[in-house]
């Protein structure tokens, strides 16, 4: 049966976060994550950077689906940050919102977060992997390698980049660490000027705490930004939910597994434009909204589209706009802590993601590669128009994925 709501058509946003806050939907006793003040500041820094990154991308990808993983980008650039020196390090520190944190604090915080977040919920698969691949004949600074290995658990390998099998070796690592969802990040032929790849990979698979019944999934109307209508599969469920609403949007929280992770969907009010909602997303607002979620008094229906998306882009221009231009300048970049001889700069930051949402749960993956070159309304909640959703871990407020969907695809 086709269903329709008389509402304004607005673009769809998808935002997936890793968020830490108490989730009443979970029935198990929660063991809190003990975060130091530095770790709390790092989480806040990653969220600030992730939201700035998302907004900048959305400017360029208007009325398009967007899906990124801020934490993946942050970790790949976090390893790179260990090789920066002088004004280049200062520029990266500012762009990544790391002011007030020493590099030692940054490294120790990432180490603890990697160890903690991957072990929180036995019913949710959440994996983080890092690697560094350098050209044989190029000798990276050993202290740089030691730091990335110790704090980011990075696998470090020297390869003959001229060997036709070298890209396959790197891409096989990517494929393995995203459970086959992202097949490659390195081109078939590696540019002779590239001397290193710093790569982060993330894989997430969460089963809904309360799964959707496939028998209730039906065709429904989804309203696109150009006023057209797309027929998509709408999943349906009636339950009690943690909710929040204000003049701009309504939001519902859907837990995974034991409740350590969840997806939060932000649906703009019908008369609001989704881009105006994006403009209001910042770290402080997000934390305020999440703290305001409460359990609904009554059960109500929600309708969510099934969708699958593969997304990718080069982040060079976006990162330059955020203040990192010097790191991309072969004449100004200073990565002498990575290679003492100098002359090394970032030639490309490539980002790829995957997400699939269905009745069972959500599967998502992300890969970021840094190429270093030498020289609450409780009525029915029907998600049939552009909306925002957040996947979060419910305790640490680290943003994991953030995206924008203007058209559900399978």
Predicted features along the sequence, with ranges:
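Detector for small/aliphatic-rich hydrophobic stretches
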Residues: 2-161, 405, 409
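C-terminal soluble interaction/assembly domains
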Residues: 348-410
């Amino acid at each position: 049966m086709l269903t329709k709501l008389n509402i304004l058509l607005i673009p769809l946003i998808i935002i997936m976060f890793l968020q830490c806050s108490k989730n009443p939907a979970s029935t198990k006793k929660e063991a809190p994550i003990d975060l130091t003040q530095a770790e709390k500041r790092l989480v806040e820094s990653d969220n600030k950077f992730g939201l700035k990154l998302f907004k900048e991308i959305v400017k360029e990808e208007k009325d398009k689906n967007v899906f990124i993983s801020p934490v993946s980008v942050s970790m790949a650039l976090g390893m790179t940050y260990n090789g920066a020196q002088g004004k280049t390090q200062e520029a990266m520190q500012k762009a990544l919102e790391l002011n007030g944190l020493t590099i030692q604090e940054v490294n120790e915080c990432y180490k603890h977060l990697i160890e903690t977040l991957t072990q929180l919920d036995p019913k949710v698969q959440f994996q983080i992997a890092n690697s560094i691949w350098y050209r044989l004949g190029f000798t990276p600074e050993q202290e740089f390698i030691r730091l990335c290995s110790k704090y980011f658990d990075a696998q470090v390998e020297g390869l003959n980049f001229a060997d036709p099998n070298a890209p396959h070796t790197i891409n096989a690592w990517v494929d393995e660490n995203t459970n086959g969802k992202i097949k490659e990040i390195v081109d078939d032929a590696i540019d002779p000027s590239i001397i290193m790849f710093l790569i982060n990979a993330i894989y997430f698979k969460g089963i809904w705490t309360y799964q959707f019944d496939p028998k209730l999934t039906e065709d429904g109307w989804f309203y696109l930004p150009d006023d057209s209508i797309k027929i998509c599969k709408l999943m349906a469920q009636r339950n009690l939910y943690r909710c929040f609403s204000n003049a701009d949007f309504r939001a519902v929280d859907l837990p995974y597994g034991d409740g350590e992770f969840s997806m939060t969907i932000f649906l703009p009010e019908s008369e609001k434009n989704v881009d105006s909602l994006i403009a209001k997303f910042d770290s402080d607002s997000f934390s305020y909204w999440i703290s305001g979620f409460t359990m609904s008094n009554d059960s109500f229906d929600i309708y969510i589209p099934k969708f699958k998306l593969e997304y990718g882009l080069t982040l060079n221009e976006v990162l330059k706009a955020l203040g990192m231009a010097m790191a991309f300048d072969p004449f100004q970049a200073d990565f002498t802590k990575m290679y003492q001889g100098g002359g090394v700069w970032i030639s490309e930051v490539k980002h790829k993601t995957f997400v699939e949402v269905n009745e069972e749960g959500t599967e998502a993956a992300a890969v970021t590669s840094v190429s270093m070159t030498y020289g609450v309304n409780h009525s029915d909640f029907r998600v049939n128009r552009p909306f925002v959703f957040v996947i979060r871990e419910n305790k640490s407020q680290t943003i994991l994925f953030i995206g924008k969907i203007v058209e559900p695809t399978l």
